Design a protein with these regions (language model features):
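A structural signal for multi-pass alpha-helical bundles of membrane permease subunits
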Residues: 2-277
Length: 277
């Protein structure tokens, strides 16, 4: 009887996982097929017997400034990744290894900042950037990206740094190493998994974002992929839905490859950074 119940439970679990996989992969498969489908109709009762083509991809590269959008987005994502890594690692190292007055209060303030959704501050962000003259600039957009992700990232990386034994620091100091040497040659190499996670998250944020670029950027030559593709499809309504599917697929491919290539580091970094030994 127990074996029967165990088998039934296993079947139920597999059915549940299969249903979830279909819910996740279904829209992806549909988008991939739609991007190769002849015609402009994204919706179809069936994909059987439908002719496929590469015309949508040709039109995307020939009729739109897609490479310009790609370049702008890549610049923003890369700049945000580099700046975030530098600021987050230095801040986390200071909070993890140094003792100073107000440290606890600062950490609690950072923790409280994580509780407020970014959408609550959209109006304040726009007014602030307008006063600073940063509307329609990449500097303004990067300012929002970097400062918005700092609270969560600092706490996460600090937790990982805390798990690195301080005895390594002390041994290095005995050998004559300074604080920066300890940071660069001991802490950072041991923190590679969490740094990969932070870098990837910092890169994918601007790459996939639509709301903030729409709020801040105004010039067509500064458009990102999300804004450019949306503007292109909305200009001719339903005529460009299959082209939109092709563009969306090309946006997702680099991120998917990055996640697959760094999956091991992401899992290790996230779990280790969340638990202090």
């Amino acid at each position: 009887m127990d074996k029967f119940i165990g088998k039934v439970g296993t079947v139920i679990v597999y059915l549940f996982l299969t249903a979830n996989a279909l819910l996740v992969l279904g829209p992806v498969i549909w988008t991939v097929l739609a991007s190769f489908k002849v015609g402009n109709n994204l919706f179809s009762s069936s994909f059987t017997g439908i002719e496929f083509t590469l015309d949508h991809y040709r039109a995307l590269f020939n009729d739109t400034p897609y490479f310009e959008w790609y370049k702008n987005t890549f610049f923003l994502a890369t700049a945000n990744m580099i700046i975030s890594l530098v600021v987050v690692t230095l801040s986390a190292f200071i909070f993890s290894r140094y003792r100073f007055n107000g440290k606890r209060n600062i950490m609690m303030s950072i923790l409280v900042l994580q509780m407020f959704p970014a959408f609550l501050s959209m109006t304040a962000i726009y007014i602030l950037l307008s006063k600073m003259g940063l509307i329609d600039t990449y500097a303004g957009l990067l300012f929002v990206y970097v400062t918005g992700s700092l609270p969560f990232m600092i706490w996460l990386v600090k937790g990982y740094f805390d798990a690195i034994p301080t005895s390594l620091d002390e041994a290095a100091k005995i050998d004559g190493a300074g604080h920066m040497t300890i940071f660069l040659e001991i802490i950072l190499p041991l923190a590679k998994p969490i740094l990969v996670f932070v870098g990837l998250v910092s890169f994918t944020g601007p790459w996939m974002d639509f709301i903030l670029p729409t709020l801040i950027l105004r010039s067509e030559e500064k458009m990102t992929l999300a804004i450019g593709i949306f503007s292109w499809i909305s200009s001719n309504s339903a005529e460009n839905f299959t082209l939109f599917a092709a563009g969306s697929l090309l946006v997702a491919v680099p991120i998917t490859l990055l996640f697959v290539a760094t999956q091991k580091h992401i899992t290790t970094g996230l779990v280790s950074g969340a638990v202090k030994e």
